[in-house]
């Protein structure tokens, strides 16, 4: 049976880059790997994919193949058939640092076989919360308190997991490494892979007598009040991190972190401006303030502020109050501006006395609206 074109096997072209060929190979090797694909013919396709990649990812072999095709390797071309080396040889000879562990480590959940020593104890799990703030809290910061159900280091055994420290022994299966080597059959090849020890669950220890409080886990569950000091200069959607305030590690490592995502209470008064430290404040004035240009006192997040209304102001106009917006960041004292967005209130009804005065004003006014038809 004639061999298929190697480019066709991998689904690439002669102009494909080395990285594109590697990417195509990765996908197909995983797709047809015998441990992942039990369909009939998968193993043969897996071998075919490996053979194609071993040529197209070797610059010399690829050049010969592009010139002579399959004949370059069957001894009829005058070059002599170099043949295909072992499976491991193929990976070790491929360029760009690509090797067996890079491609298949995720198939078995472990790292590269025989290349790493015992990993350190894993970090505790992180916790995620959302803190919904008022605009004043967002600008100036606030201390929030909340109750968390935490995994904490056992108070009785101090995380050892045993009644007495002398009751702790090295795991006899992994010799304290926390990981063991297992053999995986990959078609005609056998590969060693490093995985977590199933006897000690990666801890590397065994217990003669487990702690009665935590049953050997080294941790216990506790409800705890946590104070969260949220600083100034935060932004909705931003995450504030408290290191070491998450769950305790099950393996004696460092605790996880507490991530607080910032939210904001909806307001009819204040508005945020995307990608800006300025803050909009909606403010209603009377039609008399708009006409006369009065001075008003407005209640801002910083307290009362005097604001001069310009004569003839219109609804939607912005009046700037400097340095009363959001802080630039958590450490800066510089702030954006407060933009007062004017809304003019027109009364729907007036008293007889007001109406009389308005009529007199109307007589004095020289305003003549233009006829838009003209």
Curated annotation (Swiss-Prot):
SMART domains xrefs: DnaJ
NCBIfam families: DnaJ_bact, PRK10767.1, PRK14296.1
This protein's record includes keyword Cytoplasm: yes
Cellular component annotations (GO), alphabetically ordered: cytoplasm
One GO BP annotation of this record: DNA replication
Family label: Belongs to the DnaJ family.
J domain: residues covered: 5-69
Keywords: Chaperone, Cytoplasm, DNA replication, Metal-binding, Repeat, Stress response, Zinc, Zinc-finger
Cofactor note: Binds 2 Zn(2+) ions per monomer.
Domain notes: The J domain is necessary and sufficient to stimulate DnaK ATPase activity. Zinc center 1 plays an important role in the autonomous, DnaK-independent chaperone activity of DnaJ. Zinc center 2 is essential for interaction with DnaK and for DnaJ activity.
Cross-referenced Gene3D superfamilies: DnaJ domain (1.10.287.110), Heat shock protein DnaJ, cysteine-rich domain (2.10.230.10), Urease metallochaperone UreE, N-terminal domain (2.60.260.20)
Repeat (CXXCXGXG motif) residue spans along the chain: 154-161, 171-178, 197-204, 211-218
Annotated zinc fingers (CR-type), start-end: 141-223
Cofactors named for this entry: Zn(2+)
Function according to Swiss-Prot or TrEMBL: Participates actively in the response to hyperosmotic and heat shock by preventing the aggregation of stress-denatured proteins and by disaggregating proteins, also in an autonomous, DnaK-independent fashion. Unfolded proteins bind initially to DnaJ; upon interaction with the DnaJ-bound protein, DnaK hydrolyzes its bound ATP, resulting in the formation of a stable complex. GrpE releases ADP from DnaK; ATP binding to DnaK triggers the release of the substrate protein, thus completing the reaction cycle.
First-listed, main subcellular location of the protein, grouped into a coarse class: cytoplasm
Listed name of the protein: Chaperone protein DnaJ
